């Protein structure tokens, strides 16, 4: 993604020198310290499995859907999930409409790798009929505004959407126990996904030939930095994934330093996500109670006739 930004949009020489000189004094253009994170805000839509995340000036929206498909032959009793990203030209002039570009594929791959390799989502619980039908979960990420560090914002958006997604309940019946019945939400409560832990992504930018390290780089900083690395950890301190694009090498001490910084913040970010999801679930539960109360009251009073 660095190449796309550097090729499509460049700072002037004076602007680049100003950013670098400020970083050498451990200052950043937006007033943060080198390892400070921008404000993270999470909102949810009316439907299950939709979220909108704002990280500073970066906006990302996520939608989760699911459908019944045939399982992979090598995993007959496991469901699957996939990630698709859409970069709108409205979010960044360097984004081009049409098929996903290299940067969109890379963004989806980073998030997919952390979820898949850490086994965060229980794919076995997505099996309906072994060898025949499983749930395939799809995560769509839409970049609304690129203010820098798309990976971290998209990662949180995907996790928040997964935690609030509900799939229809299914039962297997028939004479040969091969018939699948999908129950509507009015008949049976939809089921949440089983998520074992939350892999949180933290992206670091390198400046001045790797001698300066910052956390959560902005759009302007991404145009100046010489490299990046994304570290994904959970609240327990487990390493889920490390992604280092580009050809620049990174010393082992720098990697360990990034891991320590990411681990120290993972619990706080996890709490922000869980608190937002709990507030959303409480709001939906209260609305459901009000709706049922209104329906029961109308049934007691009978139909209202307007003359």
Swiss-Prot record:
Disruption phenotype: No visible phenotype under normal growth conditions. Expressed in roots, leaves, stems, buds and siliques. InterPro entries: ExoRNase_PH_dom1, ExoRNase_PH_dom2, ExoRNase_PH_dom2_sf, Exosome_comp_Rrp42_subfam, PNPase/RNase_PH_dom_sf, Ribosomal_Su5_D2-typ_SF, Rrp45. Keywords: Cytoplasm, Nucleus, RNA-binding. It comes from the Eukaryota. One of its GO terms (cellular component) is exosome (RNase complex). CDD domains: RNase_PH_RRP45 (cd11368). GO terms for molecular function: 3'-5'-RNA exonuclease activity; RNA binding. One of its GO terms (biological process) is RNA processing. Pfam families: RNase_PH, RNase_PH_C. The keyword RNA-binding applies. It is found in: Cytoplasm; Nucleus. Its main location: cytoplasm. Belongs to the RNase PH family. PANTHER family: EXOSOME COMPLEX COMPONENT RRP45 (PTHR11097:SF14), EXOSOME COMPLEX EXONUCLEASE RIBOSOMAL RNA PROCESSING PROTEIN (PTHR11097). Probable 3'->5' exoribonuclease involved in the regulation of cuticular wax biosynthesis. Can perform exosomal functions and partially complement the yeast rrp45 null mutant. This is Exosome complex component RRP45A. It comes from Arabidopsis thaliana (Mouse-ear cress).
């Amino acid at each position: 993604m660095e190449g796309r930004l550097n090729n499509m949009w460049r700072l002037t020489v004076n602007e680049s020198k100003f950013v670098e000189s400020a970083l050498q004094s451990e200052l950043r253009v937006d007033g943060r310290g080198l390892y400070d994170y921008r404000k993270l805000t999470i909102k949810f839509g009316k439907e299950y499995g939709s979220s909108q995340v704002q990280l500073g000036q970066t906006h990302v929206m996520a939608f989760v859907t699911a459908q019944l498909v045939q399982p992979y032959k090598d995993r007959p009793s496991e469901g699957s999930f996939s990630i698709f990203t859409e970069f709108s030209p409205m979010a960044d002039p360097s984004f081009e409409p049409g098929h996903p570009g290299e940067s969109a594929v890379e963004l989806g791959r980073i998030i997919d790798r952390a979820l898949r390799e850490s086994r965060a989502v229980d794919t076995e619980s997505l099996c309906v009929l072994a060898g025949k039908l499983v749930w395939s979960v799809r995560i769509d990420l839409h970049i609304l505004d690129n203010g820098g560090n798309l990976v971290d914002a998209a990662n949180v958006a995907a996790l928040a959407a997964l935690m609030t997604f509900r799939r229809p309940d299914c039962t297997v019946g028939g004479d040969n126990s091969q018939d699948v019945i999908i129950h509507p939400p009015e008949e049976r409560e939809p089921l949440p996904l089983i998520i074992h832990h939350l892999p949180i992504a933290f992206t670091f930018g390198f400046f001045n030939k790797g001698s300066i390290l910052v956390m959560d780089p902005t759009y302007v900083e991404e145009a100046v930095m010489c490299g990046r690395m994304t570290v994904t950890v959970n609240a327990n301190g487990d390493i889920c994934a490390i992604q280092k694009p580009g050809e620049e090498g990174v010393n082992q001490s720098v990697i360990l330093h990034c891991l320590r910084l990411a681990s120290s913040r993972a619990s706080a970010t996890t709490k922000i996500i869980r608190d937002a999801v709990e507030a959303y679930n409480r709001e939906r539960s209260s609305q459901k109670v009000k709706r049922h109360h209104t329906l029961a009251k109308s049934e007691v009073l009978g139909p209202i006739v307007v003359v």
